[in-house]
């Protein structure tokens, strides 16, 4: 009997990484992991460290597309994206990324390139290795842990969130999510109504419920994310009340006003949703998933209707806590 295989794809996107990550999510519906050599060293993953640092990466550039698949060394291995799949996506994914590069060049009038590697492993190897590597993490008051790790006896139930990162769209391990959780931890949300835009795994929606919101609406344009949110609500034994909603779609389907809105997205989507957040927000807006290079362009738009109460940064990621200006309806 043939042993089942598992495929790992490694990418480096020198420019507009968040656009490429959104494309990968929309194309594959698989979770992405942002990593670096430092992270791999922390998990003592010697095999992967050797693979990414010693292999010849393949390369595609819009300024010379005829040289596709040229093997080169990336300029650095500070940040790369890992995508894992039970299927070999090489024949479809890499050409799709190349076409996406060329479309970006045409629409943004700029050159784009990316580096990539792929390898296949026995399924039993990566599953166990991944479980051993994914450890619980504390984000302010919240203790985030996978289902295969029990919560510590001293942790309060209301502070624990169970998320399986291998199966989810987001977890507390990413800087953008952890900063959202930290900002939520400091807020008194009892008897408030909340909106989670781009709910993904549902981790922020679960945190909002644990913070005491009286009514929650969550939405995502990916049907798999909606399913994941509902699954994780059940995993955490959080009932959806009559006034709670999990919606497949964007904010255009949502009516009313919300005391707090949380949106952990990407900068381009955040900028496009400004008028919607003005329409829906009564008081506090938390934005995350913004790369430092895009922060000024986001602030230029949001200064019109919101005041910046707090700004946090972790590595290249930025999160904002905003207050809606009373003069804006």
Curated annotation (Swiss-Prot):
SUPFAM superfamilies noted in UniProt: S-adenosyl-L-methionine-dependent methyltransferases
Catalytic activity, as annotated: L-lysyl-[protein] + 3 S-adenosyl-L-methionine = N(6),N(6),N(6)-trimethyl-L-lysyl-[protein] + 3 S-adenosyl-L-homocysteine + 3 H(+)
GO BP term, example: methylation
Molecular function via GO: protein-lysine N-methyltransferase activity
Protein origin, superkingdom: Bacteria
Signal peptide: none
Chief subcellular location: cytoplasm
Key words, A-Z: Cytoplasm, Methyltransferase, S-adenosyl-L-methionine, Transferase
InterPro entries hit by this protein: Ribosomal_L11_MeTrfase_PrmA, Ribosomal_PrmA_MeTrfase, SAM-dependent_MTases_sf
GO CC field: cytoplasm
Location within or outside the cell: Cytoplasm
Keyword Cytoplasm applies: yes
Pfam family, one: PrmA
Positions of S-adenosyl-L-methionine binding: 177, 198, 220, 264
EC number: 2.1.1.-
Biological role stated in the UniProt entry: Methylates ribosomal protein L11.
Similarity field: Belongs to the methyltransferase superfamily. PrmA family.
NCBIfam families: prmA
Record protein name field: Ribosomal protein L11 methyltransferase
Lineage of the species this protein comes from: Bacteria, Pseudomonadati, Campylobacterota, Epsilonproteobacteria, Campylobacterales
Gene for this chain: prmA
């Amino acid at each position: 009997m043939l042993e089942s295989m598992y495929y790992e794809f490694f990418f480096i996107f020198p420019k507009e990484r968040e656009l490429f990550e959104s494309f990968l999510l929309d194309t594959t519906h698989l979770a992405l992991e942002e990593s670096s050599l430092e992270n791999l060293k922390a998990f003592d993953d010697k095999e992967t460290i050797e693979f990414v640092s010693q292999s010849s990466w393949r390369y595609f550039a819009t300024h010379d597309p005829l040289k596709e698949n040229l093997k080169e060394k990336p300029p650095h291995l500070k940040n790369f994206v890992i995508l894992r799949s039970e299927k070999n996506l090489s024949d479809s994914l890499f050409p799709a990324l190349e076409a996406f590069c060329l479309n970006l060049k045409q629409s943004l009038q700029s050159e784009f390139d990316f580096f990539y590697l792929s390898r296949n492993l026995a399924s039993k190897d990566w599953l166990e290795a991944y479980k051993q590597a994914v450890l619980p993490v504390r984000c302010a008051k919240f203790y985030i842990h996978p289902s295969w790790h029990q919560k510590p006896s001293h942790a309060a139930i209301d502070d624990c969130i169970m998320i399986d990162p291998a199966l989810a769209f987001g977890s507390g391990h990413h800087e953008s999510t952890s900063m959202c959780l930290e900002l939520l931890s400091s807020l008194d949300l009892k008897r408030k109504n909340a909106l989670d835009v781009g709910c993904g795994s549902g981790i922020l929606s679960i945190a909002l419920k644990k913070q005491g919101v009286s009514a929650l609406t969550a939405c995502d344009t990916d049907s798999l994310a909606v399913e994941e949110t509902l699954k994780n609500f059940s995993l955490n034994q959080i009932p959806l009340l009559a006034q709670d909603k999990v919606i497949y779609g964007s904010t255009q389907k949502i009516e009313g006003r919300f005391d707090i809105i949380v949106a952990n997205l990407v900068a381009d989507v955040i900028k496009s949703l400004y008028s919607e957040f003005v329409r829906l927000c009564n008081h506090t807006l938390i934005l995350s998933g913004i790369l430092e290079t895009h922060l000024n362009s986001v602030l230029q738009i949001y200064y019109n209707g919101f005041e910046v109460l707090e700004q946090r940064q972790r590595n290249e990621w930025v999160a904002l806590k905003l207050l809606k200006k009373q003069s804006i309806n």
